[in-house]
Every structure is written in structure tokens, then in C-alpha cells.
Design a protein with these regions (language model features):
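Structural recognition of an alpha-helix C-terminal capping motif at a helix-to-coil junction
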Residues: 12, 26-33, 37, 46-58
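Short, charged helix-capping/linker segments at alpha-helix termini
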Residues: 1, 11-30, 128, 150-151, ...
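Arg/Lys-rich amphipathic alpha helix in sigma70-family domain 2
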Residues: 37-44, 54-74
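Short alpha-helical "recognition helix" segments of helix-turn-helix
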Residues: 120-121
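Short, basic/polar amphipathic helix motif occurring as a linker/hinge flanking DNA-binding modules
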Residues: 62-87, 151
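A short pre-motif secondary-structure segment
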Residues: 106-110
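DNA-recognition helix of helix-turn-helix
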Residues: 57, 61, 103, 124-150
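Short amphipathic alpha-helical boundary/capping segments
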Residues: 91-100
Length: 155
């Protein structure tokens, strides 16, 4: 029942955080396993959806860090793996994936999933000012990435 109720929201966030369907599915499954293992730590006054989202964000961070370590070992630049395409939606997805992890989490939870900023602050265990700044900076970076021609971008 928990899976059916929260799967779509968890998968959407995981996909936008990780960029790959297979990784997103793995993240959701890992989240549910971690929930099962840590159910004793769950405080009933907290919403289960928020608790699951916090676990998912941590799982995504873990997966991104592992991916970063593998990429460093393989020495493969991300630009060669995912070249930007002509489709604006694809460009937006790629631009979101290029954001730093915390900034990406704040932006995805706010702009894509519709979470209030205070809930995001609670989920990520940061101050609301940090969330607001991260969302603002994400919008600025995305605007720059999507309006500048690719050959004019500085990296």
C-alpha cells in the first residue's frame, strides 16, 4: 500500500535527480528497503510521504556520489555521455541534471513536485533561506543554460 501510494512522486523526484529511469527505479526500491529497515525510527507525527522523500533524497545523493566516483575513475566527461539535443524538454532535463546536488533537489522538489519551501527545508534539514537561495540560483543557472547558445557557454 505504501508503494502504490507514493511510488509516482518518489519516482518523479528520483528520475529528475538521477536522470536515468533504471537508476530512478533502483532508488525507489532502495528507499522502500531503507524504510522497512528504519521503521522503528519513524515518528508518527511526521507525514510518511515526507519521511519517504527524505530517505529518497539521501539515496539519490548516495547514488550520485557513487556515480561521480565511477566517472572520475573512468575519466569520462559528462558532456560526452549526454550531448544536448535540439528538443527543449531534453535540454531542460539535461540542464537540471547539471545543477549541483542540493540545488537540484531544492529545484525539483519546488518547481516540479510542488513542495512548499518550508517542507523542502525540513526534508533537507537546512534553513528556509538556504532553500530560497538554492531555488533562485537554480532558476538563474537554468535560464542562462537555456538562453545562451551552446558555443557561447563557459564551463
Amino acid at each position: 500500500r505504501v508503494y502504490a501510494q507514493h511510488r509516482q512522486a518518489l519516482f518523479g523526484v528520483a528520475l529528475r535527480m538521477l536522470g536515468r529511469q533504471e537508476d530512478a527505479e533502483d532508488a525507489v526500491q532502495t528507499t522502500l528497503i531503507r524504510l522497512y529497515r528504519s521503521i522503528g525510527n519513524y515518528r508518527s507525527e511526521a507525514r510518511l510521504g515526507s519521511y519517504l522523500m527524505r530517505i529518497l533524497i539521501n539515496v539519490c545523493y548516495d547514488m550520485l556520489n557513487a556515480r561521480k566516483r565511477r566517472t572520475e575513475i573512468e575519466s569520462a566527461p559528462a558532456e560526452e555521455i549526454h550531448p544536448p539535443g535540439p528538443d527543449l524538454r531534453l535540454q531542460l532535463e539535461e540542464a537540471i541534471l547539471a545543477l549541483p546536488e542540493r540545488m537540484r533537489a531544492c529545484f525539483v522538489l519546488f518547481a516540479v513536485e510542488g513542495y512548499p519551501q518550508q517542507d523542502i527545508a525540513d526534508l533537507l534539514e537546512v534553513r528556509i533561506g538556504t532553500v530560497k537561495a538554492q531555488i533562485f540560483q537554480a532558476k538563474e543557472r537554468l535560464r542562462d543554460l537555456l538562453t545562451d547558445p551552446p558555443d557561447m557557454r563557459t564551463t
